């Protein structure tokens, strides 16, 4: 039986070949999360970036075990804000609030 790649696998392969686009991907991931609140999609996207960077390397930089990081970013993960902040900082970014645009009716 042929095993087909998942969307995560395809995304990971793409960004491995195009690392210059990871910043836009990360920004868009958080932007979409701000709109729809879908944490499993955000965690999936962070998993992709973690695998590109290297889960063991990222876990060490964040101060977590490899298994702890994988669990936090799993589809059933419920990471604390300080974990997400540490992950984002280890990727070279920071969380920063941005004022919402007011809709004109």
Question: Where are the language model's segments positioned?
Answer:
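Short, charged recognition helix plus adjacent turn
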Residues: 52, 96-105
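N-terminal flexible/basic segments that precede or flank functional cores
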Residues: 1-44
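The DNA-recognition helices of helix-turn-helix-type DNA-binding domains
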Residues: 76-77
């Amino acid at each position: 039986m042929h095993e087909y790649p998942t969307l995560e696998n395809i995304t990971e392969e793409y960004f491995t070949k195009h690392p210059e686009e990871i910043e836009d991907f990360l920004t868009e991931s958080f932007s979409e999360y701000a709109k729809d609140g879908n944490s499993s999609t955000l965690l999936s996207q962070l998993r992709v970036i973690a695998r590109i960077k290297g889960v063991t390397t990222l876990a060490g930089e964040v101060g977590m075990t490899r298994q702890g990081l994988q669990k936090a970013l799993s589809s059933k993960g419920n990471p604390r804000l300080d974990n997400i902040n540490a992950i984002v900082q280890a990727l070279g970014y920071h969380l920063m609030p941005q004022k919402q645009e007011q809709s004109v009716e």
